[in-house]
Amino acid sequence: MKKRRWKKMIALSLLFIFFSSNHIPAEPLPQDNPDETQEENEIEIEEPKNLYALSACLMDADSGRILFGKEEDVRRANASTTKIMTLIVTLEHADLNNVVTFSDYAASQPDVQLNGASGEQFLLKDLCFSLMLESHNDSAVAIAEHVAGSVEAFAGLMNEKAAELGCMDTYFITPNGLDKEDENGFHGTTAADLARIMSYCINESPMKETFLEITQTPSYSFSNIEGTRNYSCNNHNRFLTMMDGAISGKTGFTGNAGYCYVGALRRDDRTYVVALLGCGWPNNKNYKWADTKQLMQYGIDSFEKVNLLELEIPKEAECPLEISGAKTEDYSRIKMTEVQNRTEEKQIENILLRKDESIEFKLERKQRLEAPVEAGTTVGTLKYILNGQVVREEKLVLKDSVTAWDYR
């Protein structure tokens, strides 16, 4: 990938559109140092290159914005990275103090295994550590059967959650990520969807703290309910000690999926998620760490957090609106009433911008209205645009009601 040279964009661009299609050019904001030379304002950004993974995604976990992608929307098998969804569904649907009994089917799962015996009982909490630290396939099935009654029903919960999170190219069949296919397709996801799931697990889920506690634990020991067998688990997510700020992650491997990984890192007020699919096959176990570090470092070096609510919006957005036919103290029948912006649903407030990027505004607003009008009447929209995509939209509404002139 070639290096790109960019001029530092200090000003926000503005596209102002009246309903009559008038245009106002952008006006730059004052620079921090107007004496800076062009060379001093020049920014050099090098994008990730030579990644091993077939699919890769770097995501801003707070906004869901994809900061870098390589075939990030191609569905592939994802092996044990599946287990982040298994864990979050379990945490949101069951009490960790429940007792889980291994079935014959759970006990028959292939390696990697806890080697629980059919009929053996464990605390659900203990099996969650087994699931995430050692990636035990039998524990995943035992958990699924306990939470939903069957693996199939649990997969239904997983797919419901995926759809809820906007993961449109994800289909889960197994709770452990083992390769499988049925009449609806094959078990798999995309790098972008996998990053969305991890972002939810660490940022939005009501059980995010428990998710982080489990996935950050270096080692964990427990026994079965009878106390006749003891078990020890060690965390195989080496990325936790590779970079400052690493907070979670899950590895995966099958012969079909190759090495896979999803991990999260938090630096100050920025949270990054990396998802990798098909990142090498034996003997290339360390490719995923190289790709993860390169993507995370790119995010740290190249992006800054911007609070959209602190940006200076176009002054034209909230200037008074002309209301004709209004009841006034004189005979003008014209009243100027205030306009304010508001949002009625949850929208992005903070977003990571690359140092060569800027937000543009698109303003659509009526020029005048006829009385009577009610407070809260929508008179336009203010859109925040990044690289041609709307990242936030606010309604412009009348602050006060205006009564019509009584001609009687």
Predicted regions and their residues:
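Short, Lys/Arg-rich N-terminal segment immediately upstream of the first membrane anchor
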Residues: M1-R5, G69
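Sec-dependent N-terminal signal peptides of Gram-positive bacterial secreted proteins and lipoproteins
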Residues: R4-A26
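Domain-terminus/edge residues, biased toward the C-terminal soluble/receptor-binding domains
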Residues: G185-R408
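Hydrophobic alpha-helical segments, especially transmembrane helices
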Residues: K8-M9, I84, R267
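Active-site-adjacent loops and short helices of periplasmic peptidoglycan-processing enzymes
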Residues: A26-E209
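Residues in and immediately flanking transmembrane alpha helices
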Residues: S20-S21, L96, E310
